[in-house]
Amino acid sequence: MTNLLWQKPGVAVDAKIQSFLAGDDVILDREFFLHDIAASKAHAQGLQHIGILSPQELDGLSEQLDLLAEDFRGGAFVLDEQYEDCHSAIEARLTERLGDAGRKIHTGRSRNDQILVATRLWLKDKLQRVATLSAEIAKVALDRAQAEAELPVPGYTHIQRAVVSSAGMWWAGWAEAFIDNAVRATDTLQLVDSNPLGTAAGYGVNLPLDRAHTTAELGFARLQVSPIYAQLSRGKYELAALEALGSATLDLRRIAWDVSLFTSGEFAFVALPAQYTTGSSIMPNKRNPDVIELMRATHASVAAARTEIEQLLSLPSGYHRDLQSSKGAIVHGFGRGLAALELLPALLANLEWRPDKLRAAIDSGMYATDVAVEAAVAGVPFREAYKAAAEASDTAGQGRTPEGSLAARVSPGAAADLQLDVLLARWETLR
């Protein structure tokens, strides 16, 4: 490893210790590299504004930073273990190409605020993707709720048959859930949308840095004012972002559970397209819903990332190297979470209900609640009506149909009044 920015003259570097210090940092930094380049370009512009760089030096730095980004995207520049991290790679490249102008780029900043701004930009991108995917999932669910509003589906509590429900109600539930998930991701994006660049190591610098310029140039909504808080917010903002992602993957886990049950032979309510299943290495008859099961497992990875960062934050104020580990947590958490969410819209759009199996699973006792409510409407005290319906639950379905039960369910949001227009109006505000 070369280009240690902090190495002091006459002090030897122990290779094993340095390897431990670096860990997999430079590999993880590939996620943040383009954001670090963009922030370096904005920082250079700010330095030119206060006379640290000449216009000619700024032009050279801007050109080389653009070329570095292009080379990285195209594979001509590889961020690997010869560098300690992405920050040293940028400075080494600029110094190699531009000499003293490259050596000036770090004036007024620390790797502390450098990684803060790069990860902050990265989190904004990821949260926007969570919001977009959540909105896409909600729209698929809304469309299917409208199309299948009257399709009877058994309703369960405690995984026991309970009442007659509908595909419309099932889809509307997931639609509202993912509308909320989109809102939460957007709200969290607004929280993290503050610029820490220019806070240096966490105590500011004796330069009149043009932080207003870097805030605008990098597209931040506001300046993160306090250098102390800039360091305190590292981990805190990552935690908030993972919580927003976790809100979506938690619902993903539950919808995957439903689909896993519904595709089993014991239920057989739903047919999955073949591309969402795999086979067994020994049992020729098997079609395994592995995609659904791995979706269900995704939330565990997100929750683990959240827990890792939460445990890292048992620290006093100021920067601590412990926080380096937060990078791996967010990369792995968002990597797993977004990969699963990306598959969900198409999966939901291609689910096929099996109406004969759905209807066969609706038994007489599932009308007992209807009988009790109807008696209460007729003037019988509900508790008495409940007892009578319980005693006659085996015959409660006589003369009744699933469609009739659904048509009578007129409370707002229930089967006869799904209020999809209300949900659609909420969805429209997401765009």
UniProtKB/Swiss-Prot annotation:
Catalytic activity as recorded in UniProt: 2-(N(omega)-L-arginino)succinate = fumarate + L-arginine
Keyword Chloroplast part of the UniProt annotation: no
Keywords, in A-Z order: Amino-acid biosynthesis, Arginine biosynthesis, Cytoplasm, Lyase
Record carries keyword Manganese: no
Cystine bridges: none
Pathway this chain belongs to: Amino-acid biosynthesis; L-arginine biosynthesis; L-arginine from L-ornithine and carbamoyl phosphate: step 3/3
Main localization, broad class: cytoplasm
InterPro entries per record: Argininosuccinate_lyase, Fumarase/histidase_N, Fumarate_lyase_CS, Fumarate_lyase_fam, Fumarate_lyase_N, L-Aspartase-like
A GO MF term: argininosuccinate lyase activity
EC number: 4.3.2.1
Pfam families xrefs: Lyase_1 (PF00206)
Gene Ontology annotations for the cellular component aspect, listed alphabetically: cytosol
GO biological process terms held by the UniProt record: arginine biosynthetic process via ornithine; L-arginine biosynthetic process
Top-rank taxon, per record: Bacteria
Major enzyme class: lyase
Localisation per UniProt entry: Cytoplasm
Similarity-based family: Belongs to the lyase 1 family. Argininosuccinate lyase subfamily.
Name of the protein described by the UniProt record: Argininosuccinate lyase
